[in-house]
Swiss-Prot record:
One of its GO terms (molecular function) is phosphoribosylaminoimidazolesuccinocarboxamide synthase activity. Its EC number is 6.3.2.6. GO terms for biological process: 'de novo' IMP biosynthetic process; cobalamin biosynthetic process. It comes from Deinococcus geothermalis (strain DSM 11300 / CIP 105573 / AG-3a). Gene3D superfamilies: ATP-grasp fold, B domain, Phosphorylase Kinase, domain 1. This is Phosphoribosylaminoimidazole-succinocarboxamide synthase. Pathway: Purine metabolism; IMP biosynthesis via de novo pathway; 5-amino-1-(5-phospho-D-ribosyl)imidazole-4-carboxamide from 5-amino-1-(5-phospho-D-ribosyl)imidazole-4-carboxylate: step 1/2. Keywords: ATP-binding, Ligase, Nucleotide-binding, Purine biosynthesis. It catalyses: 5-amino-1-(5-phospho-D-ribosyl)imidazole-4-carboxylate + L-aspartate + ATP = (2S)-2-[5-amino-1-(5-phospho-beta-D-ribosyl)imidazole-4-carboxamido]succinate + ADP + phosphate + 2 H(+). PANTHER family: MULTIFUNCTIONAL PROTEIN ADE2, SI:DKEY-6E2.2. It holds the Pfam family SAICAR_synt.
Length: 241
């Protein structure tokens, strides 16, 4: 049973429960880009992201990646382990795209010879600036051991998801992960894996099936999210209500 709201972010609300070691997460339809500068609603996004995350996190657990996920409660809600989020976001890149391609003068779609792992400070106010391990350790955001474990888990996520999506006709271009620490100090994957946090391209056409359709005003955002839901879970489209 969910109690008072503990936190509201751009895409989710987090509620306390009767168990102090568990939260309820509610997924919203709110869409933001450029650290909240651009805002809109994507019909059914909350349901779709909840469903995709609830499908993928148990598979990642089986693949050896501990997560905060416990169970899907409803169309928009899931029960999770309570964690303290580590304020270092991890980006894993298989292909040059987005800010990475722009920053380095690369053509979007350029394959990378090996996965690139980048770290950002989790701060909308500062625009999620890139940081390195020395900065994270020096400023107390994470320890060297934390970052070593986070990198190990992020690459394990990549090694599982890349072929998983490929088998469904999807190229996993890059993705963002967040990790948290449980009450007993275990580092686990938190947040979500969805078209909000990943770049997905159709393997045959390179059509974008993710939030870039919203960021870049490409249209067809709801249809792209519904298509990802269908390919990942086999479920149908979105609820228009």
């Amino acid at each position: 049973m969910k109690l008072e709201q503990r936190y509201e972010g751009k895409a989710k609300k987090v509620y306390a429960t009767e168990n102090p070691l568990e939260y309820v997460v509610e997924y919203k339809d709110d869409a933001t880009a450029f650290n909240g500068v651009k805002r809109a609603q994507i019909v059914g996004k909350g349901q779709i992201n909840n469903a995709i995350t609830a499908h993928l996190f148990p598979l990642l657990e089986e693949a050896g990646v501990p997560t905060h996920f416990l169970e899907k409660l409803s169309e928009r809600e899931q029960r999770v382990r309570a964690v303290t989020i580590i304020p270092v976001e991890v980006i894993v890149r298989n292909v040059a795209a987005g800010s990475f391609a722009k920053r380095l003068g690369l053509e979007e779609g350029t394959p990378l010879a090996r996965p690139v792992v980048e770290y950002c400070l989790k701060s909308d106010a500062l625009g999620d600036p890139l940081i390195n391990t020395d900065t994270a350790v020096a400023l107390g955001w994470a320890s060297e051991d934390d970052l070593k474990r986070i990198r190990e888990l992020a690459l394990k996520v990549r090694d599982f998801l890349t072929p998983y999506f490929a088998a469904r006709g999807i190229r996993l271009i890059d993705f963002k992960l967040e990790f948290g620490r449980t009450h007993d100090g275990q580092i686990v994957l938190a947040d979500e894996i969805s078209p909000d946090t990943c770049r997905f391209w159709d393997a045959a056409t390179n059509e974008k099936l993710d939030k870039d359709r919203f960021r870049r005003d490409l249209g067809g955002v709801e249809d792209a999210y519904a298509e990802m839901l269908r390919r990942v879970t086999g479920e149908g489209g979105r609820d228009e209500g």
